[in-house]
Amino acid sequence: MTGGGVLATMDPVRKLVRSQPKIGRHPVAAGQDGRDRHPIRSWECGERARTARTGRTVGRAADPSDHGPSLYNFGGCVEINILGPVSIDTSHSGGGIRAGKVRTLVATLAIDAGRAVSLADLVDELWGATPPDNVLNALQAHAARARKVLNERACPERAGGILRSVLGGYLLEIDPQCVDGNRFLRLVSQGAALLPADPTRAVELLETGLRLWRGPALIDAGEGRRCRGAAALFEERRLTALEDLISAMFLRGGEAQAIAMLQQLVAQYPLRERFCELLMVGLYRVGRQGDALESYRLARKRLDDELGVQPGALLRRRHAEILAQDPVLKVPSALWREPYAPADTSLLSA
């Protein structure tokens, strides 16, 4: 990944933001007890998860094969977290940012790490339609506070050089990989690209990416359009990564674990047809044809009651295949027929 960051080309997110100017908070993922370290719920625990398989800490770049060189080689000891409450971690300290405007400013610049963000865009993000009369002075004051926070937590050789004022804007001069959102996008895209050929490695990458989450993305970054648009994008990619993870588990023959995950996800996201489809196939594969058909009936009822629509063509096709006991349902790679190709990677730089 080069200097483009999370939104290496901003067009996709700008379109999203413009089409949904009032994007709100994200729904919370399934499971609320804060105990399970499963990828669905690891970010609800409020701590860095460790993989049950290897014991590696996955909140930081412990495995070069997953993340490349140590994060602390990228941006002078600074790691900015946006997959949850906004925070700054370094090799010697870390924590959140108390001041709301400073937090929003750091988050907005982190979304475009390595790229300048214009003064106009920053003003819009911090104040929206009601900027103060002395808005540029106010922005400079918040930038000075943000620079102070970053400098206090950076290693000595980078102190003073992370947040820069450039012509017409500000720049967070760190490698995009120092932002957890970028690492998440990279990992889950790499994992999806391995399907269906290497489901074991795909599971490792997808789980590692999903465990970077500590809560809803950019949850405390304010209501500006850039942060809310990016948060909506991250949430969609998180759900897609969960779909890919479950498909990879099916490819490895892990139906029992996948079914348990899917039952939680269907309860949490009852209108997301892909989760229901995967659950139906999983139930059928373990000999629970009746439960698979009941899952379809419930999904159809929810869609009709809440949206007044019928299930989509793919869900209806799965229903017909289950009724007919179609042998295709037992084929390991059946779930990877078009249109379920690996997740789009156009948001990542080459």
Curated annotation (Swiss-Prot):
DNA-binding segment(s): 69-174
Ranges that cross the membrane: none
Presence of keyword DNA-binding: yes
Molecular function (Gene Ontology), one example: DNA binding
SUPFAM superfamilies in UniProt: C-terminal effector domain of the bipartite response regulators, TPR-like
Keyword terms, alphabetized: Antibiotic biosynthesis, DNA-binding, Transcription, Transcription regulation, Two-component regulatory system
GO BP term, example: antibiotic biosynthetic process
UniProt family annotation: Belongs to the AfsR/DnrI/RedD regulatory family.
Protein name, as recorded: Transcriptional regulator RedD
